[in-house]
Amino acid sequence: MLMSVSILCLFFLINPYQIMIYLMIMTLFLLAKGLINNAESFINFFFFDLMSLSMVILTVWISILMIMASKSNNNYKNKIFNFYLLLMMNLLFICFMLENLLMFYLFFEAVLFPIILMISGWGSQPERIQAGFYMLMYTVFGSLPLLILMLLKNQSLSIIFNEWLFNEMGFIFFLMILGFLVKIPMFLFHLWLPKAHVEAPRAGSMILAGVLLKLGFYGLYRFKSFFFLDLLKFSFVLIVISMWGAVLISIFCLYQNDIKSLIAYSSVSHMGITLAGCVTFQLHTSFGMLMMMIGHGLCSSGLFCLKNMIYERLHTRSIMMIKGMINFPNLSMWWFLFSIINMSAPMTMNLFGELFLGLGLMKYSLLLSLPVMMMIFLSACYSMFMYSYINHGQSWMIFSNKMISMREYYLMLLHIIPMIMWFLKINFFMKWI
């Protein structure tokens, strides 16, 4: 019934406020259903567990915030833009609940097309076509080996895998998980992400950083039981590349002049430590991975919103040009809050996420202590660098007379509240473990 309502809304719900009401009702329904029954299977190939619940709620929440954020520009009244937005939300909604692995793969790839169309059609620069092309090539060709092997080894559309299929695959194992590593994105496969973020409209950056990057972790989590032995064998290689990349990208963030690129590269850094923790298969890291996915999704979405609030008034993304925001205390307060959340300050989910990921990695090998501490330290450095450059100093630009609206205040507040509430309800995530 819920899926039929979602499909009908794709064609008949054009007013964004009606969409928001529909999404809020769906969120409440999922919360009530998920808290009452933590795992169930229905309609043969749909499956609903705590991780699915968390990802679906995050998807719906970010979609609501996307609609609120798009109200200030012409996209708000664009029916095609609203259609792509709601289509992508429904594709994600189905993807996070599918139990059939072939169907999961199809929806996993189908989610790409709405975001590529949003980047190519509503991006602000001519380079948006190149950004969409990069994203398409990396993600589609990265996941083709998985589809080919699935079809070669099993002719049934049910895709019930046999144990012998995934024993001692060696190099083929990397080809199978390449599609997930590109989506995360893992260091060395991350070049598409900064381009996509820089050229995407505000709503596109929000859903890309908030939800789409988590699809890679979700797919890895769903498929890990099929190549568990290979993951154990090659996990150290993935951990070393991920942690080394997280440290290098964190250093690179300190040299960024474009604020949107800085936020995009910080996402790559945080996803690096999350991937490293994911492949250790420990209770600490499983708990930290889920919290980091949700906390980072809300934090990065909020940072892109803040960036756009400044861009609408100063028409520049250069950190060297954006200065003196402390003269606008309300705006400066939001920058301070999201900067400390980005560096995993207390009272947020990111703190526990990085804490459990770090503990799990150190338990896996003490040699990882140094890169973990370096990554956490550098994360604090570039977050402080971003806040201090934006808020202090003499501004080179004339700030627009356009005041911060109540809609924008609510938008920022709705990013903060879930992180604090979930921080106070940590035992909700422990049910997954």
From Swiss-Prot:
It holds the Pfam family Proton_antipo_M. Signal peptide: none annotated. It is a multi-pass membrane protein. GO terms for molecular function: NADH dehydrogenase (ubiquinone) activity; ubiquinone binding. It comes from the Eukaryota. It catalyses: a ubiquinone + NADH + 5 H(+)(in) = a ubiquinol + NAD(+) + 4 H(+)(out). Its EC number is 7.1.1.2. This is NADH-ubiquinone oxidoreductase chain 4. InterPro entries: NADH4_N (IPR000260), NADH_UbQ_OxRdtase (IPR003918), ND/Mrp_TM (IPR001750). It comes from Rhipicephalus sanguineus. It is an enzyme of class 7 (translocase). The chain crosses the membrane at residues 10-30, 45-65, 80-100, 101-121, 132-152, 169-189, 203-223, 234-254, 261-281, 286-306, 331-353, 366-386, 410-430.
